[in-house]
Structures are given as C-alpha cells and as structure tokens.
Amino acid sequence: MAEHLELLAEMPMVGRMSTQERLKHAQKRRAQQVKMWAQAEKEAHSKKGHGERPWKEVAGLRPRKHVLFPPSVALLEAAARNDLEEVRQFLTSGVSPNLANEDGLTALHQCCIDDFQEMAQQLLDAGADVNARDSECWTPLHAAATCGHLHLVELLISRGADLLAVNSDGNMPYDLCEDAQTLDCLETAMANQGITQEGIEEARAVPELCMLNDLQNRLQAGANLSDPLDHGATLLHIAAANGFSEVATLLLEQGASLSAKDHDGWEPLHAAAYWGQVHLVELLVAHGADLNGKSLVDETPLDVCGDEEVRAKLLELKHKQDALLRAQGRQRSLLRRRTSSAGSRGKVVRRVSLTHRTNLYRKEHAQEAIVWQQPPPTSPEPLEDEDRQTDAELRLQPPEDDGPEVARPHNGQVGAPPGRHLYSKRLDRSVSYHLSPEENSAPDALVRDKAHHTLAELKRQRAAAKLQRPAPEGPETFEPGLSVDAGTSQPDCGFSTIGDPPLLKLTAPSEEASVEKRPCCLLM
C-alpha cells in the first residue's frame, strides 16, 4: 500500500489523467492494498503458530473499562435520574448528601428543580442541609418557589428552610415565586413566624453590613482596599456587582480606583452595568467613572448592560457627561485666549467703546437736525397730553417789552429769559443728546441750560411756533392789521401763578416782511 506522502505527490498527475486512465490507476492501487492486507494477515497467523495467543484466550474474559467518577458527580447523576436505590447505596456507603458540583449545586437543589419529592425526603432524612447555597446563593427553597412546586415548598418549610434567605440578586423566595398557591403558602408561613417588613429589609441588608464590617476591620489593620482579589477583581468590583451603596461610598472615600480592571478588563462600572445596579452606576459616574472604558474585547459598560432601565440611565449620563466636557473645553479655550492677550486687549476695548459712543452722539445730532428742518404739517395734528401741557405753558408767557429788536431764536422759540427753562415739568425725562458743549455760544444756538431736550419737547416747541410768528423789525407793537379775537384779553406782564390765562391768538397781516431764515441748530 502506498504511503500517504506518495499519494499526495501523485495527485497533480492524477488530475491531468483522463477518465479511463484514472480508473486503471485506481484499480492498481486497490490491488496493492489487498496484497498488503493479505501479507499482514499471514504474519499475524504465523505469530499465533509460535505460541503467542491473544490475551482474550488467556484470560477468558473481555477487558473491563475502569472509568471512575468522584462521589459528588455520581450522587448528583443518580439523584437527577431519580434512582432512589442507587442514592440509598451512596448514602449508606458514607457519601455526604451535601456534596456539590462546580456550581455549588447539591442533590437537594436538583430534586427541588425536577420535583422529586421522595428523593428530597430521602436526602433530608440523611442529613442534607435544607439551606445549602450554590454559587449564586440560591437555596433549595429558592428553586422550589421559582418552579412553583407547592408540596416541596411545604416540605422544606417544615424542615426549617430560611424564608428570608437572600440570593446574590437580593431576592428572597417569595420575590421569585409566581404561582399563586405557592406564594400564599410562603406568605402564610412568614406571617406565622412573625416576619414584618422591617425584618425583611434588615435581612436584605445583612450581606452589605457584613462586608462593611469587614472593610472597617481592614482599615484598622492598615490594609490596602484597592488590592486585587480573585480573578483580579477589587472590593469596589464586588460592591458594584452586588449593589452595596454604603460599601462603595466608603471605598471611594478611601481612594479606591475607579479604573481598576480585573482579568477580563472590566472596571467597576462594567460590573454595575452588567448586574443592573442602577444606583451604583449613578454613584460611580458621579465620582468620575469612565463611561467609555473598554474591556479586553473592547466592550463598554453600555455594551455589557442588558437591563433596559440601566441602559437608559447610562445613555442619559453619557449625554450629560459629554455636554459637560464640551462646556469645560470651551471655558478652557476662552481662558487661554484671554490669558494670551491680557496685555493689550483691555486698551483696545476701551478705545472701541469711546469711538462707538462718539458716533452715537453724532447720529443723534443728525436726527435732531432733520426733525427741526422738516416743514410744518398742512393739517393741524391732534394735540396729545404733552401738547396740551405746552399750550398751558405758552399762556403763561409774558409779552415782550417795547424796545429795540433783540436777537430771536429760530423756529419760534418762545421769549423766555435765557436762563429760564420752559419745560421744567419734564426735567425728569432722560437726556438724549447734548447739542452745544461750549460755554459762550452764538445767539442762534441753544444755550447750555436748554441744551438737553427730548424729541417730545421739540414737538412742543414746534407747536408753540405755530402760534407765534416773528414780528417785523422795529419796536414790538401791534400793527393795525393785527386784531385780537373776541372773547380774549391781553395777558398780564409777568407769569401768573394762579389758573391758566386765556391764550392770545393773533392774525397775521396780509404781507409780512421777509425774515431771513437761519438754521435751527449747529451740528458739532
């Protein structure tokens, strides 16, 4: 028979053969195989002829396979098959009924899962622990209550099962029970034992209190709380996985590392997210845990989280953390810009501020000039409250004394003394502009006392200008063409302090002397 390497070497040649050639080649190889087999059989018979007999003929028996299993495996396998006789033999031979497999599961756990009441009775009679716990702290009562096996629950309670046993998820048997009759049995038993809600909460807090006491003992001994334990996990990993808020708070106060990783690259936040501990997730993130931390297989806490509530909380915290980091980045960038230009930036801002203020004043002066240069409206506008007040003030004006002509202000400024402000009632208005800053201004400019006006005051001055026209040159006397309306009288000289005197209305003559128009104000 050809060797394996020889067959591999001839494969390219066989691939180039035709169908008939391949068939002949296969027959040749088959003949070689039969020949070699016949030769091997001949050699075997020749050895038997020389006195070498097979061991079967010498012993007269078939060989027995000796495969041995540990007692724990054998007991659990027999209990899973519900083999009462075999289990009885194991127990009689001295095998402990509390033997467990690698997951901490005992034969009694298996009976409560499979609903083998007689097997459970036999194990309990042999001394099985009714409160045995597996690797996740489940007792046989947890298993029976979860599966809804009422008769097994009653049996375990009668044998002293702990009704307040808490598993690694913080659940008691009645928390896991969904069958109504089984749940009623558990609640009745708890009521008979006098268990209250306070007792339930205390029982839930027992594991955390035990770990808290252990931590305090370690602190007194000066131990490092960040040292890794089994599988590289730290105490903060354990607290995060079990939801121990007080323990985690103490560890964080003592400086426990939030970035410590176990052998799988998991940080404490990974453990809290995987086991659905939403309070621990918030606590760790509040102390600066990295929501983007990755394990050895590039898994973030969000990737390993299977609980929808915890997942939503992680997403919310991630959005808040990203927004906070962006805000801090902007503040740092702004601080760097301010620091780099601290030598000259203040002066530039002040120069720009003064220029802007000057331009604003100039714009206001230009707007005021446009208002003064507009022609009076053709139709009389209805007087507002401020116009009525202007009319009342005009009635208080004294007639001008006879004498040589004096310089008149333009646009019908009333003839009050220069130091007298006609709008004393409006001095509380805000000052909007300043026309003439010089102390000695020309007669046609506003004096300093009248330099501050608002647009409403200018409107009143224009209303007053309609009622009073400039007289022709010469002594200030009434012309023959001027007439006084009926029902009015000449006002007294001086300002009257009581009441409002009647308004003197004058009718202009048909021909007026031309008066040279001057600009109303000076633009600075």
UniProtKB/Swiss-Prot annotation:
Domain of life from the UniProt record: Eukaryota
Q: List-wise, which residues carry Cysteine methyl ester?
A: 521
User: Which tissue types show expression of this protein?
Assistant: Highly expressed in testis, followed by liver, heart, brain and lung.
The UniProt gene name for this protein comes to Ppp1r16a
ANK repeat copies, ranges: 70-99, 103-132, 136-165, 231-260, 264-293
Q: Report what the protein is called.
A: Protein phosphatase 1 regulatory subunit 16A
Chief localisation class: membrane
GO cellular component terms given for this protein: cytosol; plasma membrane
Compartmental location: Cell membrane
Q: Annotated region Disordered: where?
A: 368-421, 462-524
Where are the coiled-coil regions?
448-469
Q: Where is the composition biased (Basic and acidic residues)?
A: 514-524
Q: Where is the lipid attached (S-farnesyl cysteine)?
A: 521
Where is a lipid covalently linked (S-palmitoyl cysteine)?
A: 520
Q: How does it assemble?
A: Binds PP1.
| Topology of this chain in the membrane | Lipid-anchor
Functional note: Inhibits protein phosphatase 1 activity toward phosphorylase, myosin light chain and myosin substrates.
Q: Which InterPro entries match?
A: Ankyrin_rpt, Ankyrin_rpt-contain_sf, Pase-1_reg_su_16AB, PP1_Regulatory_Subunit
Residue numbers covered by the propeptide annotation in the UniProt entry: 522-524
Q: What UniProt keywords are attached to this protein's entry?
A: ANK repeat, Cell membrane, Coiled coil, Lipoprotein, Membrane, Methylation, Palmitate, Phosphoprotein, Prenylation, Repeat
Positions of modified residues (Phosphoserine): 432
Which Gene Ontology terms cover its molecular function?
Answer: protein phosphatase regulator activity
